[in-house]
Amino acid sequence: MIKKRIIPCLDVKDGRVVKGIQFKGLRDIGNPVDLAMYYNEAGADELVFLDISKTEEGHSLMLEVIEQTASRLFIPLTVGGGIQSLDDITQLLNHGADKVSLNSSALKNPQLIKQASDKFGRQCICIAIDSYYDPERKAHYCCTHGGKKMTNIKVYDWVQQVEQLGAGELLVTSMGHDGMKQGFDIEHLAKIKSLVNIPIIASGGGGNAQHFVELFDQTDVSAGLAASILHDRETTVQSIKEVIRQGGIAVR
C-alpha cells in the first residue's frame, strides 16, 4: 500500500506567506523560508509554494526564496504560480524546485503540459486545478488567476485531458471549501480519482485531523494539503499523522 502524504501549502504574495478564506481576505502568516524550515523539521512529507501574486500581477519568479529554501530542505518542494513557459520551469528546477505546478498557463495552452512532460519528465509536472461549483449550471469549472476568473472548462473533462497530455500529478483545490475548515469535498475528489490514474493531492477544507482520516478512508487520493490549521498552530503535521494511523491508514 502506498503511504499517504501530508503536505503544508505556503501561499506566497509579495515575498510573504499569506492565507485567506475562499481565496479572499489574505492575512500575513510569516517568512516563507522560516516556515518551510519549520515544516521540514515538523515531519511534512513535501512542501508546496504557490506564488499567488505572480499570475495576477506578473512579477518575476521568486527564485531567490526558492533557492534559499531548497538548499536547506530534505523533502520535495513543488512550486507554482504564474509559470508561463518551458524557460520558467527550467529556472525553477535549476533553483531547487523538485516539481512545478501549472494552472492558468496550462488552461490557456494545454500543449505546455506535453512539452514540459516530454522535456523534464512527467514526475516533475503537477497540474493545479482551482475547482468552482456553479450551482446554476450544476457543474464544476476550472478557475484561473488565483481563483478570480472562471473558465468554461469543466473539471471532469480537464483532468482526463491533462493526464493524456503527460501530467504526473493533480493538485485539486475545492474553492468552496478553501479555508472553511469543515472537511474536504469528498464526493468531488472521489469522482476525479475515478477518472484518472495519476496521484491526486486534495486541497481545501482540512480543519482537523479527522477530516484527513475521512479523506483517505473515503477516497483514493494520495495526499492531503493543509494550510490554515498548520499556520495557525491549531495542530501539527505529526498530530494529524498520528490520528490517521489510529484510523488504520498507512501514512509516511
UniProtKB/Swiss-Prot annotation:
Tell me any Pfam family this protein matches.
His_biosynth
Give the EC number(s) listed in the UniProt record. Answer: 4.3.2.10
- Give, as in the UniProt entry, the pathway in which the protein acts: Amino-acid biosynthesis; L-histidine biosynthesis; L-histidine from 5-phospho-alpha-D-ribose 1-diphosphate: step 5/9
Question: What molecular function terms (GO) are annotated for this protein?
Answer: imidazoleglycerol-phosphate synthase activity; lyase activity
Annotated GO biological processes are:
L-histidine biosynthetic process
Reaction(s) the record says it catalyses = 5-[(5-phospho-1-deoxy-D-ribulos-1-ylimino)methylamino]-1-(5-phospho-beta-D-ribosyl)imidazole-4-carboxamide + L-glutamine = D-erythro-1-(imidazol-4-yl)glycerol 3-phosphate + 5-amino-1-(5-phospho-beta-D-ribosyl)imidazole-4-carboxamide + L-glutamate + H(+)
Provide the alphabetized UniProt keywords: Amino-acid biosynthesis, Cytoplasm, Histidine biosynthesis, Lyase
Instruction: Tell me where the signal peptide lies.
Output: none
| Compartmental location | Cytoplasm
Q: Which domain of life is it from?
A: Bacteria
Family, per the entry? Belongs to the HisA/HisF family.
This protein is called what?
Answer: Imidazole glycerol phosphate synthase subunit HisF
Q: Which source organism does the UniProt entry give?
A: Staphylococcus aureus (strain bovine RF122 / ET3-1)
